[in-house]
UniProtKB/Swiss-Prot annotation:
PANTHER family: SMALL RIBOSOMAL SUBUNIT BIOGENESIS GTPASE RSGA, SMALL RIBOSOMAL SUBUNIT BIOGENESIS GTPASE RSGA 1, MITOCHONDRIAL-RELATED. This is Small ribosomal subunit biogenesis GTPase RsgA. One of several proteins that assist in the late maturation steps of the functional core of the 30S ribosomal subunit. Helps release RbfA from mature subunits. May play a role in the assembly of ribosomal proteins into the subunit. Circularly permuted GTPase that catalyzes slow GTP hydrolysis, GTPase activity is stimulated by the 30S ribosomal subunit. The lineage of its organism: Bacteria, Pseudomonadati, Pseudomonadota, Gammaproteobacteria, Alteromonadales. The keyword tRNA-binding does not apply. InterPro entries: G_CP_dom (IPR030378), NA-bd_OB-fold (IPR012340), P-loop_NTPase (IPR027417), Ribosome_biogen_GTPase_RsgA (IPR004881), RsgA_GTPase_dom (IPR010914). Pfam families: RsgA_GTPase.
Length: 354
């Protein structure tokens, strides 16, 4: 069987355009009337609290939350965006739509993840810090932490590592987990341990969140929603159990939502993901996002060094000298190895949808 030729850039653009048309057609509410300009009031500022297809919940200047249509000229709107809205002079009670989003202010930061169709998809914006939540159950893994750290470094959003469910930590597991967390502290990442169930460490987390816009990131089952509920009980987010069969958490939060904390600051709770794909990043960028590698990058004997068993590799020499952790070095190679696999999966998906 002959191998399929890679898709051209033109084919990829047409595929994405057709996909966007399908999304707009499927998500458009034919029963929702368009708001006419004559029925709209003056422009005012607002913040996107949550996005639902072609609608968004907007917090207005006076603190009210209203559901608005989104102008078709707006190609990207996510939770955390600062926007210009116009509210309907007379509320359309039957539709539940109270206004329209006219424009989006420039973002000072954004958190993105790769999308099989659209390349890179922004999932939240105007974020001051990322709280990377890991836990004892599902089993603690540094691979997921390192993927989120790469994403944070790539977007230049300061990360904080949170270990949740420490009430489940056994004496047998504790030494290895403590050693792994210390490696992150040694290279400059702040690490905190909490138990959302027992309330341990929550006051420290509240202080970290004060006067900032934060986002919780982490795989399903690590207790992000439970942690949010402990910090803000009135949020009433759904909480899922850990699957008995797989040990993986059930997806609970269904859409990113911005929440106000009584102690000050905002929190964006975003849907959990089982793996944070990074195939949109070139290998050189991934290496730069491992912050302890930076002093050694460019010091290899050969410019095309793969940082494996290549002779004269500065990174490998740093690992051997104890200047770079072997675990982090191995996770770097796991990420690099996954890049081609994920790119191939995207291309296969694209070809299948033709």
């Amino acid at each position: 069987m002959s191998k399929k030729k890679p898709l051209s850039q033109g084919q990829l653009r047409r595929m994405r355009a057709n996909h966007e048309k399908r999304l707009n057609r499927d998500s458009g509410d034919k029963n929702t009337p368009e708001l006419q300009d004559s029925s709209l009031g003056p422009e005012q500022s607002g913040t996107v609290i949550s996005r639902f297809g072609q609608h968004a919940d907007i917090e207005t200047e006076d603190g009210h939350i209203v559901r608005c249509n989104i102008r078709r000229t707006i190609t990207s709107l996510v939770t955390g965006d600062k926007v210009i809205v116009r509210l309907a002079i007379e509320s359309q009670a039957n539709s539940g739509i109270a206004g329209i989003v006219e424009a989006v202010h420039p973002r000072h930061s954004s958190l993105s993840r790769p999308d099989l169709y659209d390349g890179v998809k922004i999932i939240a914006s105007n974020i001051d810090q990322i709280l990377i939540v890991s836990s004892v159950l599902p089993s603690f893994t540094t691979q997921i932490i390192d993927r989120y750290l790469v994403a944070a470094e790539d977007t230049d959003i300061p990360p904080i590592i949170i270990l949740n469910k420490i009430d489940l930590l056994t004496p047998e597991e504790a030494p290895a987990i403590e050693e792994a967390l210390k490696r992150y502290q040694d290279i400059g990442y702040p690490v905190y341990k909490v138990s959302s169930k027992l309330g341990e460490g929550l006051e420290t987390i509240k202080a970290l969140l004060k006067d900032k816009v934060s986002v919780f990131a982490g795989q399903s089952g690590v207790g992000k929603s439970s942690l949010v509920n402990a910090l803000l009980p009135e949020a009433e987010l759904l909480v899922g159990d850990v699957s008995d069969n797989s040990g993986l958490g059930q997806h609970t939060t269904t859409t990113a939502k911005l929440l106000h904390l009584p102690s000050g600051g905002d929190l964006i709770d975003s849907p959990g993901v089982r793996e944070f794909a990074l195939w949109h990043l070139p290998a050189q960028r991934v290496g730069w996002c491992f912050i302890e590698f930076r002093d050694f990058l460019g010091g290899c004997k050969f410019r095309d060094c793969k940082h494996g068993d290549d002779p004269g590799c500065a990174l490998k020499a740093a690992v051997d000298a104890g200047k770079i952790s072997e675990d982090r070095f191995n996770n770097y190679h796991r990420i690099i190895a996954s890049l081609d696999e994920q790119r191939h999966a995207r291309q296969f998906r694209a070809q299948s949808d033709e």
